[in-house]
Amino acid sequence: MIRLGGWCARRLCSAAVPAGRRGAAGGLGLAGGRALRVLVDMDGVLADFEGGFLRKFRARFPDQPFIALEDRRGFWVSEQYGRLRPGLSEKAISIWESKNFFFELEPLPGAVEAVKEMASLQNTDVFICTSPIKMFKYCPYEKYAWVEKYFGPDFLEQIVLTRDKTVVSADLLIDDRPDITGAEPTPSWEHVLFTACHNQHLQLQPPRRRLHSWADDWKAILDSKRPC
């Protein structure tokens, strides 16, 4: 059951409490070092944005051309649809601006289980870091509702809503967007590209690396950022 009435007044005023198991020093690991901080993107990493969009687009506009997932190229869905036919960009945007779009997205395979396990690791703080769309009538609320549905109410403290992820301090950012820019030219985090239909064809230059899916060895990526 979604219990969002309470947190609107209560949780947003409280300080975030990291999800990982901490030492007694409020964020320090058991050996006295700082906990590893991991940011996990939501759409395309936890929630199946691309699949959810395509299903709803085809249902609402059955007579319009569409782009199969294997043919998706580029992060911005609306741009590729706009090149396909005039007017399709606006139709695409109308899908994710609609009520319940974000809430009804299905989790990607293994995503919920992996992030719950990640958050339970010693000396590890996990935050869901997501950028709401500018048409904010439904999106921010539904993102919170989605997290509560799949991760439970306590994980609401672990959400970071921001249009600029470069200003958020962390060790790792797992995100499907290939190019993440903002006010901070040198973010503190390493960007690990999560493989999605729109970016799977890209060749990354070392030292950049991917997480191909939640069945991939995400623990090894985290361990590579921990002190020896």
From Swiss-Prot:
EC code(s) of this entry: 3.1.3.-
User: Which body tissues produce this protein?
Assistant: Highly expressed in heart, brain and skeletal muscle. Detected at very low levels in kidney and pancreas.
| Entry keyword Mitochondrion | yes
Gene3D superfamilies membership: Deoxyribonucleotidase, domain 2, HAD superfamily/HAD-like
Which keywords are on file for this protein? Answer: Hydrolase, Magnesium, Metal-binding, Mitochondrion, Nucleotide metabolism, Nucleotide-binding, Transit peptide
Chief location? mitochondrion
Q: Where is the transit peptide?
A: 1-31
Q: Which CDD domains match?
A: HAD_5-3dNT (cd02587)
GO cellular component entries: mitochondrial matrix; mitochondrion
- Which InterPro entries does the record associate with it? 5'(3')-deoxyribonucleotidase, HAD-like_sf, HAD_sf
Q: Pfam families from the xrefs?
A: NT5C
Q: Where in the cell is it found?
A: Mitochondrion
Active site positions: 41, 43
> Where along the chain is substrate bound?
43, 49, 75-77, 96, 130, 165
Enzyme class per UniProt: hydrolase
What does the similarity note say? Belongs to the 5'(3')-deoxyribonucleotidase family.
State the oligomer form and interacting partners.
Homodimer.
Sum up the protein's function in the record's words.
Dephosphorylates specifically the 5' and 2'(3')-phosphates of uracil and thymine deoxyribonucleotides, and so protects mitochondrial DNA replication from excess dTTP. Has only marginal activity towards dIMP and dGMP.
Protein name (Swiss-Prot/TrEMBL): 5'(3')-deoxyribonucleotidase, mitochondrial
Gene name, per UniProt, is NT5M
